């Protein structure tokens, strides 16, 4: 992320390798958070402390974080729930880049995990895009299953959804 103050930041998912695998166990969950560290472009390396800034929602397995800034808020978008039919796009925000981040009141910006008959399924990942005329869109991955079956023969496809901001900044 390239902040408007000139600083640059690296975000990544932290994986708990003590865990027995995807989904983990209550004692040692596989997912251990989204971490943030500053990047020094002159030195060409990460510098300073690594900070765990986002635990995700109870849906779990958060990955693919991106940050963008709007009206003094840092918004983090991430994928949750794996890449199958529980896939979802989660949003959180903070006034400071290193958190704390609060989850969107509805948790998910985009998902069809609870709508098994929706024509677009497996929505997740993605990035916010602002057009030159000030409109916002969220690009994301998804799949279109064949009618009556849960097979998406075209695999993961790209989709785009228009975003409308509320008065509360969500």
Question: Where do the PLM segments sit?
Answer:
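Carbohydrate-active catalytic/glycan-binding domains of CAZyme proteins
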Residues: 1-170
């Amino acid at each position: 992320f390239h902040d408007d103050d000139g600083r640059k930041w690296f975000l990544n998912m932290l994986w708990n390798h003590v865990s027995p695998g995807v989904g983990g166990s209550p004692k040692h969950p596989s997912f251990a958070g989204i971490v943030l560290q500053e990047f020094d472009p002159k030195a060409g390396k990460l510098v300073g402390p690594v900070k765990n800034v986002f635990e995700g929602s109870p849906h779990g397995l958060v990955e693919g974080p991106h940050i963008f800034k709007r009206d003094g808020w840092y918004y983090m978008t991430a994928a949750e729930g794996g890449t199958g039919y529980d896939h979802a796009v989660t949003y959180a925000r903070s006034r400071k880049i290193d958190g704390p981040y609060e989850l969107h009141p509805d948790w998910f910006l985009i998902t069809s995990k609870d709508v098994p008959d929706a024509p677009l399924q497996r929505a997740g990942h993605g990035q916010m895009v602002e057009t030159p005329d000030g409109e916002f869109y969220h690009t994301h991955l998804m799949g279109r299953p064949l009618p009556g079956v849960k097979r998406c023969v075209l695999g993961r496809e790209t989709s785009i959804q228009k975003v409308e901001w509320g008065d509360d900044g969500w």
